[in-house]
Amino acid sequence: MGARIAYLAAGIAVAAWLAALFGCAGGGTFNSGERAPWRQQAEDECVASGAVQASAYVVQMTPIDGPGVCGLERPLKVSGLSGGAVAVSPPALIGCPLTAALDRWVDASLQPAAKRYFGSRVVEITQIASYGCRGRNGNNFGKISEHAFGNALDIAAFRLANGQHITVVNGWWGGPPRERAFLQAIFAGACNE
């Protein structure tokens, strides 16, 4: 039970941290209103920019419309970032703006921090929640989570090329000093996206 609460707390912390990657906004209820127009505009601008390209690691899926305001016009199944150099396991269902932000974050923050603190590169990100029509923190009676629009990814762990495995729950709270420093550095880097 304690481990489950710790993983939930870690997921919440990482979701809040990754929300900074795309400047999440707004909430509301699932079955009222329409998706805010800026969401589609951000998606269209991202696609038009060419920041995210279809590949063996990024595959466009069929549109998700609903229930209610939930959904994405162009969901992407992402199994790798940074040109496939960093696996995403299991593959994440997210939108173009978050995919582009994650690619930038991997290159500008994640890899430099891994090299600095461990002398190795990150080769895999373990995610525990991507697209899902739900409320924030799993509360379906509160504001809608950015997961409901493909704008959030909960990360549980990182695997390095040297075989080291760093979990958010253990590293953030009471892990070795360099694991904590690594996680704090990549958290700060996410805030710059």
Segments the model singles out, each with a brief description of its role:
Residues 25, 29, 144, 151-193:
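Catalytic cores and adjacent binding grooves of peptidoglycan-active enzymes
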Residues 45-126:
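Active-site acidic/histidine clusters and adjacent loop/turn architecture
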